[in-house]
Design a protein with these regions (language model features):
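N-proximal, solvent-exposed amphipathic alpha-helical segments enriched in charged/polar residues
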Residues: 1-18
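Short, non-transmembrane amphipathic alpha-helical segments
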Residues: 7, 11, 49-64
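Short edge beta-strands and adjacent turn/loop segments
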Residues: 17-33
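Solvent-exposed beta-strand sheet faces enriched in polar/charged residues
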Residues: 23, 35-37, 72-74
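Short active-site-proximal "capping" loops at secondary-structure junctions
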Residues: 27-29, 41, 77
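Histidine-centered active-site/metal-ligand motif
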Residues: 31, 50, 67
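A short interface-forming secondary-structure element
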Residues: 33-48
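C-terminal structural segments of small proteins and small subunits
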Residues: 55-87
Length: 87
């Protein structure tokens, strides 16, 4: 079972400036939702952003320790904009 802190640390190991919030959707530690804010996402498409995150998670995906991840990937500027819009 993957802990929230382990998931955050895995993501931050590849996206060192990332601010990460995670939520276990099922209580089983294998279905997660994440909001990830990183300057590394600048100029990248949604698919490219998700690929960066999946690179960080290869080890737990390969072992099925992580089965599903829903994510929102934002640059710091996009995050600030979403806060000001109340979303």
């Amino acid at each position: 079972m993957l802990s929230p802190q382990s998931l955050i640390e895995l993501i931050q190991s590849h996206l060192t400036d990332a601010q990460v919030e995670v939520q276990d959707l099922t209580g089983s530690g294998d279905h997660w939702q994440a909001v990830i804010v990183s300057s590394a996402f600048g100029g990248k498409s949604r698919v490219q952003r998700h690929q960066l995150v999946y690179q960080a998670l290869q080890s737990v995906l390969a072992t099925n320790e992580l089965h599903a991840l829903t994510m929102k990937t934002l640059t710091p500027e996009e995050w600030q904009q979403s806060l000001s819009q109340g979303s």
